[in-house]
């Protein structure tokens, strides 16, 4: 790797603004806000709107839309089961 062209990779805390869930991960993104983590160290705080704690796919609250096909519409129209 060339020196001086890559961004600094450091540990940051991501916080889900909907649920307040926090997790520690690595990122090149920085922030002026900081938070003290469970290990006693202070890390930059990055706020996110959606994480695995609030996304419907991961929480099991996902809704599936079923679209009726042509055969289903025909059967419904003519009362065929």
UniProtKB/Swiss-Prot annotation:
Q: Which domain of life is it from?
A: Bacteria
Q: Which organism is it from?
A: Bacillus cereus (strain G9842)
- InterPro entries according to UniProt: Ribosomal_bL28/bL31-like_sf, Ribosomal_bL31, Ribosomal_bL31_B, Ribosomal_bL31_sf
- Per the record, the gene is rpmE2
Tell me the keywords, alphabetical order: Ribonucleoprotein, Ribosomal protein
Instruction: Provide a GO CC annotation, any one.
Output: ribonucleoprotein complex
Query: Per UniProt, what is one GO molecular function of this protein?
Result: structural constituent of ribosome
Name this polypeptide is given: Large ribosomal subunit protein bL31B
Q: Which GO terms describe its biological process?
A: translation
UniProt subunit comment: Part of the 50S ribosomal subunit.
Give TM segment ranges: none
Indicate the family of this protein. Answer: Belongs to the bacterial ribosomal protein bL31 family. Type B subfamily.
- What HAMAP family does UniProt report for this protein, alphabetically? Ribosomal_bL31_2
PROSITE patterns reported for this sequence:
RIBOSOMAL_L31
